[in-house]
Amino acid sequence: MPPQSKSITYLPLLYNPFLNCIFNNPHHSKNPFRQTVQELSENHNDYTILVPPAHILHELFDPSTEKSSTKIRLHDLCYHNEDFIRSHIIKTNTTYPSITSSKSSSAIYVTMNGKQILIKNGIVFTGKGFKKSLRLKVLDINYFNSFCDYFPKGSKFMILYIEDSMFGSFDPNVPVSMQSREMDEIKIEPTLKKDQQFHDITFEKLLRSFPLLSNAVSDKFYKLFHHNNYQFRLLRTNTRKKLSSIKFEFQSMLDEAFKVVSDSVKIDTPDSEQTYHLINYILRLYPGLDLNRLVHEYVELNLYDKLWAQLIFQFDFPDNDKQNDDSDAIKILTKEKYDHLACISLNQLDVPTDKPWHINELHKRIYKAIDEFSKLSDASILNSSGKTQILKNTVNILTNNVKQISEIESMTEKTGSDGITVNADILIGLLIMVIVHARVDNLEAHLYYIKHFNSVDYTNDGYFCYILSNFDAVIYHLSSSMNDEPQYAGLVKSSALNHKFWSLIDSGDTDNLLVLLDEVQQGLGDSKLPNNHFLNSRTVQGESCLMMAVKADNSDAFNYIINYNYQWFSIDDILFDKNTTTNQSLLTVALTQESYNIITQLVEIILSNTTLEEQILYFNSVDNSGRSAGHYFHHSPNLIDQIGFLIDWELKDLNSHTPLFSLCRCYDHPDYATLLEKGFDCIYKKYGKESIDFDKHIDKMGNTLLHIILKDLSKTKLLTSETNLINVNQLNYKNLTPLDLYVKYNRLENLKELLKDDRLDFKFEDSTNFYSVFDFLGSSTAKSPTNTVLKEIEKLIYNYCFINYYPNTDTEKIAALNARFDTTKKDWALFFIKSNKIPTLNAETLDRLRKFTYIFKLDHTHSFFPDNETFWLNFPQEKSMVPIFAKFRINRIIEHVNMYMISLNFHPILTNEKIFENFFVKNRNKSTLELINDITNRQESDKRKFSNLVLGIAQVNEIDFFLRFSLTDLVNFQTTIAKFNKLVAISDIKQSDLRIVTDRMFNCLFSSNILPSVLLREYNFALTNQYKNQDSSYKELLTFTAWLELSTIELTKNIRRILLKLDDWKELHKNIKELNIELTKYEEDAPTRYATVVRDSTTEADTTDTTDATDATHASPNLANSTNGNLQQAHQLEAEAEEIADTSSSFFSFASIIENKKARYKKLLLMKAEEIKKIMKLNAELKFDHECIAAEISNFLKFKSNFINLGIKRYVRLSLCLSKIRKYELTKLLNSCKR
C-alpha cells in the first residue's frame, strides 16, 4: 500500500464503473473500498469478480428504489455502496474440482459479504442474502490485467461478465402496462392448452381418472361387452344378415350402455349420490362436454372389431339378390374396377379448366387428398369420428377450405385463394381421382359405418351432408349398373390408352411411340389437341408425358413428342410442366437425371421463346425443398456459362443453402475445381466484387463458404480479392472457424491458402469451449497418428507458429501447444513441440513445469528470469476456481510458459544450452533434492576457483561503482517501462470500451429506427460480449513489456543482493583495520623478543592495503598489522597466538595486568584471523557474483532490444489483423444500410 502522503494520480476512466472503482480508484484506501481492496491485494487468486455490463450500470437504476421518489443509478452504487461492490466478488478458495472445461458443472459460492450464489451451466443464480432471486447468464470470462500500484505487480484477476447486476435493475422509461401484457400472454397459453386437452377427453380416460365412476360402471360394462353375452350373439356370428340388423344390434347395445350410466345414479344403487355429484363435477370441469358422445365412442371402442368384421362379411358375401334383398350391402369398387381405372387422368374427367397453372394446383390438391383419404385404411381409425374427419379433411383439401363452412352458397361453389372455382361438377371429378388412386378397400362399408354408427347426428349439418352426397354420387357414377353407359366405358378406354402411351415412353419403345403419334397426327392434323386427349394426360403426381420422358431419360421420346407438331404443346405447357408432388420443373428433373440432351433442348426452347422476365422466373422457380435450377448446376456445370446470369445466387433452400453454397458442397464432383471457378466467376460478373454479400451464403448451421469448400480455395478468389467482404475467423454453430475445420477434416490445400491471409486470427479461441487450432490438431493426431496428410498439416501449423510467434534464430525453439487433464496424475499435461526438422511431441505436467522453473532459477541465480513465485503469481498450485475457468486458465498458462521459452531463445548464453532437454530427459528421474545438491555442489566448485583470491579496496570500489551505476540505469528503465505498461493496459481496456460504446450506439440507432431495425437481428449489436480478445492488440504488446518489467525487477533485485555483500565486505575490511590499530598498540609495548617479531611484521604492513589481488604464495609474512590477507595468513595468526600462549612466562612475567594484556592480544589475533576467513569467503563470492551479474547485465541489454522487437512485430501484425476484422464488420453494416 502506498503511503498516504503520496500525491493522488488519475488515469483515464474505464467505461465500466464497477471495474473502474476496483482497479482505477485513487481513493482505494478510503471507505467503501478499503477493506475490499485490501482483501483482494492479499490474495487475488482466491476471488472471482462478477462484472455487469457497462451500459446497464450507466443507464439503469437500483430496483430497491423503484417506488421511491429518489431513484439511484447502479453507477452510483459502484462508488458509494460497499454491499453492492462486495456482492459482486465471490470467494473461490474452496475445495472444488477445477477439471471440467465446459459450462456443465455447478457450485455454490459465497460473496465477500457472506451472500450465496449458484453457478450452473453458465448461469448465475442469486441465493441466500440477496433480496431478489435472479437468473443471470454468463456472457464471457477473462483475466483482467491489473495496472494499479495497490495490487501485486503483474497480477491478473478472474472476471465473469454477467448480463445484469446481482441486485437486478429497472428502467423507469419502460411502461408497466407492457409488463402486464407480457403476463397476460403467459396466462393465456395454459388456457389454450386446456381447451386443446378438452377435445382429447374420452370415457376411458374418465374411468381411469375417477375411480368412483369406474367402480360404479366398470363391472356392468365388462359384462355387457363380454363374448359370452348371449343377448348380443348376433354380432359374433358370421352369417348372411341385413345391414339394418347389425345397426339394430349396435343401437340396442348402445342403449344398454346408456342405461348402465343412468342406473349408476339411481337412488337404489350404492354410492349413487356420490356418483351423481361426481358426474356433475365432471360436467362443470369440462363445460359443454357431451357425455352421450363419450359413452357412444366407448361402446365403439369395445365393439369396433366385431362391427367392422360383420360389415366386411356382408359386403363381401356373394349374393346376386342383394339388389333386391339388401341394396346397401352391394360392393361396387372392387379391385378389378380400381385396376381398370388406374391410369385415368384428370383432363379426362370433364374438369372445365385448361390453364396449366390451375391444372398443377388441382393435381397438388388431389395428391394431398389421396394421402388423407388413404387413412381410412389405417387400422388405428377405430370410430366414426375419425372416419368422419377424414372425409371432411379430404373435401377441404380439394376445395382449399381451411374452415368448415355450412352456408348454402359454399356447398355449391368454393373459390380458393388461387382463383380456382370448385363447383359440384369439378368436385365430382376430383373425388373420382382421389377414390380411384387411393384404392381404399371396402369404401362402401366405411361410408355406411359413418352414416349409421356415428356418435354425432349430422342430419342438420348441411356441409357434411353435401360431402356425403358427393361421395355417393361418385360411387353411383362408378357403379356396375352404369358399366354399359358410354361415359363409364370412355373412362375405362381412356385409362387403357393412357397406360399404353405411358408404357411406350417408360420402356423406350420409340418405334411404336412414333406409330402412335402418327395416328394422332392423321386424326387431328395441325389442329390443337383436345383437352381430354391422352397426350395431355397426367399421372396422379401431375407428371405429363414430357416429364415421364425426362424421368425415363428417354431423350428420343422427348424429342419426338415435343417436336412432332408444334401445335400440340405451347410454351406455357412447358413452363408449367411440373411434378406436383415435388414441385420440380422439367429442367430441374432433367438436371437431377443428368439428361444432357434434354437439358440442352429445354434451355434452347425456353431462351428462344420467352421474355427475360419469364426466363428469370422459370429458372428461379423452386421445388418443395426450396431449390431452383441453380441448386442443381453441379449436374451440368456448362449451364452456368449459359444461364448463370439469370440465376438468383442468393436464393436459399430449406437448409439455407444458396446455389453457390450447393456448388461448394459437391465434394464428389469429378471436376470440383472447374465447378468452383465457373460458379464464382459467374457471381463476380453478375453482382460485381464490391456488391457481393457473402453472409447471405451461410447455412442454418452457421457454415460460411470458407467452412464448406473442400479444396481448390484459390479458384474461388475469396481470399485473394481485397474487395470481398468475408470474415476468415467466423464461427459456425459448432464453434469451429474455417481454420479449425480445415485442421479437423484434413483440408490441406485450403489450409495453405488460409495461412497466407493476414486477416487470420491464428490464436483465436471460441468463447464457449475455449478451443484453439492446436486442440483440434491434437485431437486429429491422436485419432490418426500415421495419416500422411495430417503430418503435412502438423508441419504447416508448427512452422506458422514458430515463424510468426517466435524469434527468428538458428537455435532450437520449444513451444507449448495445448493441454489435457491427466486423470491418473490429477494434473494438466502440456504438449510441447520442438522446431527441429522432425517435430516431436512431449507431454509434461504442470507440476514438472513448476519444478523446472524452480530448478532453473536455482541454477541461474543471477539471471533476469523471474523467480518461481513471481512467475506463477497468477497460476498458483492447487488453487480452486469457477469450473468454467479451467480450460481458459490452462490456455493462459500455455501462453505464459511460451513467453518463458521465447525468453530462453533470446538469451545470448542460455540459447546454446539445452536446458529444457537436460531437465526433462537427462535428469528426469532425479528428485528435486538431488538436483538441488548437484546445483549447490557445482556452484561451490565454481566459487572454490577463487578461494585464494585477495580483493583490494580499490577493486571492491570498482565493483561497487559498476553495480550502482548499472542499478541506477536499470531503475530508470524500470520506472519508464512501468509507466508504459500502465498506459498500455489502460489502452487495451479503452479499445474495448470504444468498441462497446460504438456497438451500443448502433443498437440505439436500430431501436430508434434511424437505421433499419431489420438489420439488428443480422448484426446483433446487443453487447453479447463485454471485453473480447479481438477488441484490442495492446494485450499482445503488454505481454512482452510486462515480462520485460518483471525481468528488470529481478535483475535489480540481484544487483541489490550483491551490493549488500559489498557492504558486508567493507564492514569486514573496516573491522580488520581497527583490529590492526589495536594490535599495533600492544606491539609497541611488547618486550624485545616480541617487538622483533612485531617490527618484522610491520615492515610491509602498510603495503597490503593497496595490493592488487594476489596469490597466497606472494603474501607478506608479516601478519599482525595486515588489513587484508588469505587463509594462510589467518592460519599463521592463529599459530602465533598459540606461540604467545606457550612463551607467556618469558614475555609476560609481570603482574596480573600483564596477563590480561596477553589474553587481549591473543583474542585480537584470533578475531583478526576469523575476519580474514570471512573476507576471503566474500572475496570468492563477490568475484563469482560480479562475473555472473556483469555477464547477465550485458545479456539483458542485448535481450531487451531483441525481445521488444519481437513484441512490437507481433503487436503490429495483430493490430492489422484486428483492424481488418473491425473494418469488415462496419463495412458490412454500411453496405447493408445502403441496400
UniProtKB/Swiss-Prot annotation:
InterPro entries cross-referenced by the UniProt entry: Ankyrin_rpt, Ankyrin_rpt-contain_sf, UPF0507/Ank_repeat_27, VPS9, VPS9_dom_sf
Comp. bias intervals (Low complexity): 1100-1115
GO biological process, alphabetically ordered: early endosome to late endosome transport
Any GO CC annotation of this UniProt entry: tubular endosome
Domain VPS9: 323-487
PANTHER family, alphabetized: ANKYRIN REPEAT DOMAIN-CONTAINING PROTEIN 27, DOMAIN PROTEIN, PUTATIVE (AFU_ORTHOLOGUE AFUA_1G09870)-RELATED
Similarity-based family: Belongs to the UPF0507 family.
UniProt name for this protein: UPF0507 protein DEHA2G04334g
